[in-house]
């Protein structure tokens, strides 16, 4: 098959007629498929169901002499802090264990910077005229929603194969109103990029003009390989301390895609000084998070080695789904020259870049044919993709058979949108 751009107008018209007919056939199937969010499938959730049988007798609820059924331990039970320190490669004293969502802790961290200021703030951010934030793109839509909700001016910085464009980042942080930066350093959402060692070093070594700059390190996929062995990653907290930036980084992780998205455990890791500061503030809003759930996770996951064994089981379920999507893109899209895409080996997403001006149209056609996907523009601040080209595919939820149907629809819609753009 020729690339669409190399076809004659007559060839494109013939191709358009064939693709349009295929699209109408797919519409007539009455499909209702969803690839919108990176949800674990039922089969993955079933792997973890035995966690609910671990606490049955009264004595089971005691950990390190603490009865987890009672009040207290705002920063998390010691056993949970040890577990997540082991997984993240930091110290237990640097870990705060919260409720089921790391996103809540991210929101809380930004919120407290606005209401109270951080340890090195001259004043709470709500009293500042302007707050700006660095946003690597394409990125995670919910990160952008957090900063947008506080009226922050978000500055897009392009991602490269090594991570964010560090030359641009290092220039931006010279502005004292630039107060933070979002990061998903391992298997980034949505591209699956792993930050290089040099990028991580440059981030840790930054000297921002703002004394209270927040390096937000969302390590959501720290153990989420599906097509390779576990990849060790630098301890950003220790690295920042080595460069004199001990209080700059705030690391986040959760078990949302290890155990249950709706009943997992979210954590924040940072310097001991930051953990003490946030514990003091959070102690006003809660007397403690769900310590019973924290203990369940300690007993079920045990340590990093056992957790990685569980992640291999998740990987065995996920890998065929990613392969199904990538195989379809290889066969149906790559030869036509109408999109580029990444081949992740970890994380939960596949990122596709269409020809400029085709993402919204592709997704509108998908919806018409019964396939729901992440909205166009979601991977950019304010939901505005300047090229209207990036699409995030989430293969994890549907069974492989449904996924193959959904990706067939996607490929057909992408072809149709590209042909329309080329004037077929």
What are these regions (language model features)?
Residues 2-75, 79-80, 85-86, 368-371:
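N-terminal "arm"/small-domain region of PLP-dependent enzymes with the aminotransferase-like
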Residues 38-42, 102-103, 139-141, 162, ...:
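Short, solvent-exposed loop/turn segments at secondary-structure junctions
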Residues 98, 238-319, 332, 419:
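Conserved core segment of the aminotransferase class I/II
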Residues 312-326, 338-353:
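Conserved glycine-rich beta-strand-loop-beta hairpin in the small C-terminal domain of fold type I
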Residues 351-356, 373-415:
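Conserved PLP-binding active-site segment of the aspartate aminotransferase-like
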Residues 362-368, 406-411:
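Short amphipathic alpha-helices in soluble, non-transmembrane regions
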């Amino acid at each position: 098959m020729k690339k669409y751009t190399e076809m004659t107008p007559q060839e494109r018209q013939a191709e358009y007629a064939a693709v349009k007919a295929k699209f109408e056939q797919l519409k007539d199937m009455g499909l209702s498929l969803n690839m919108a969010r990176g949800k674990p499938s039922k089969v993955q959730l079933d792997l973890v169901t035995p966690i609910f049988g671990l606490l049955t007798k009264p004595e089971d609820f005691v950990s390190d002499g603490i009865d987890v059924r009672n009040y207290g331990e705002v920063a998390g039970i010691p056993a949970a802090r040890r577990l997540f320190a082991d997984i993240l490669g930091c110290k237990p004293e640097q870990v705060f264990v919260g409720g089921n969502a790391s996103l809540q802790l991210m929101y809380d961290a930004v919120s407290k910077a606005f209401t109270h200021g951080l340890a090195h703030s001259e004043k709470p951010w709500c009293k500042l005229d302007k707050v700006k934030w660095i946003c690597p793109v394409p990125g995670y839509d919910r990160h952008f929603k957090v900063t947008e909700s506080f009226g922050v001016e978000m500055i897009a910085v392009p991602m490269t194969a090594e991570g964010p464009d560090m030359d641009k980042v290092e220039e931006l942080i010279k502005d004292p109103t630039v107060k933070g930066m979002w990061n998903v350093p391992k298997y980034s959402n949505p591209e699956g990029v792993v930050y290089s060692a040099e990028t991580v070093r440059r981030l840790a070594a930054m000297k921002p003009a703002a004394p209270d700059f927040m390096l937000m390190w969302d390590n959501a996929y720290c153990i989420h390989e599906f097509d390779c062995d576990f990849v060790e990653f630098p301890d950003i907290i220790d690295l920042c301390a080595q460069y004199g930036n001990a209080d700059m980084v705030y690391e986040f992780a959760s078990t949302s895609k290890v155990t249950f998205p709706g009943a997992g455990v979210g954590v924040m890791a940072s310097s001991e000084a930051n953990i003490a500061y946030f514990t003091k503030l959070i102690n006003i809003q809660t007397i403690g998070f769900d310590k019973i759930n924290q203990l369940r996770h300690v007993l079920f996951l045990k340590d990093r080695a056992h957790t990685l064994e569980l992640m291999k089981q998740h990987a065995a379920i996920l890998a065929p789904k990613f392969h199904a999507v990538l195989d379809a893109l290889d066969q149906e899209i790559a030869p036509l020259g109408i999109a580029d895409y990444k081949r992740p080996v970890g994380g939960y997403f596949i990122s596709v870049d269409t020809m400029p001006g085709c993402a919204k149209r592709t997704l509108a056609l998908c919806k018409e044919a019964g396939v729901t996907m992440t909205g166009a523009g979601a991977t950019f601040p304010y939901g505005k993709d300047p090229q209207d080209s990036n699409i995030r595919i989430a293969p994890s939820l549907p069974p492989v058979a449904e996924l193959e149907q959904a990706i067939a629809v996607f490929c057909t819609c992408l072809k149709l949108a590209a042909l329309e753009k080329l004037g077929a």
